[in-house]
Amino acid sequence: MTTDTFHDLETFSPTPLKNGTHIYAEAAEVMLWAFCVEDGTIYVWDLVNNSLHWIDDLAECWVSRPLLEGVLPHELSEIIDDPEMLVWFQNGGMFDFVVLQRALPAVLDRIPMSRWRDTMVQAFAHSLPGSLDKLGEVLNLHEDKRKLKRGKALVQLFCKPRPDGGRATKDTHPVEWQEFIEYAGGDITTMREARRLMPSWNYKGKQIELWHRDLVVNYRGFAVDVELAQAAVRMAARVQAKLAEEVHTATDGD
């Protein structure tokens, strides 16, 4: 029996995302990795400061513990290495997988493609909005609009270079960094609730197999005969020049 786990990455790259995911990912860094198992405790792994954060149910506040640099928290490692754990991301197929290929390839290698799932793809498969905030509106997940606005501001602060070329960090913005951690945890709450409320009849079995196959093709790419392609470009240029000359002759230069 499989178990759903939910994940969200907060990343930084000096390259704007609008330039394309693969170009963005070439220099991307994973700063935070939020995750949970079904309705269990939500954890946020701070890779920049080597710590793990979660809400203490008794104290009703965020607590943390230090981690060794480069070592996954055992809570996440157990998920990654358990073949019965399905790994859900929001737009994970076209973003998080690509980023992990570059930033944490050794971790990605431990998660077979067959265990990947995507709440955005599930939403699109049922004619629902893909973005998490719009999906939340449709599913009546009454999110605090102020928190959403604040979260977007934190993403702007930490996930992009500053106008002067510098970078905001926990050292420069300690209060905002803690807010950023809590924001990452909040996205997990929305994602798992959306997964629970969405239909799944168009995102199971054969449909998921086809989605996995599509991802493999996208990641692998396809072979191109470069010499033939370049010859086609040259041929097109010659034909266009010939047609332009014919039009010029037929219209007496008009």
Labelled PLM ranges:
Residues D39-S200, K206-W211:
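Active-site-proximal helix-loop-helix substrate-binding element of RNase H-like nuclease domains
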Residues M1-E10, T15-L17, A27, L32-A34, ...:
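Conserved "right-hand" nucleotidyltransferase catalytic core of DNA-directed polymerases
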Residues Y24:
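Non-catalytic, usually N-terminal nucleic-acid engagement modules in DNA/RNA processing proteins
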Residues P16-T21, V44-D46:
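Short, glycine/acidic-enriched capping/hinge loops at junctions between secondary-structure elements
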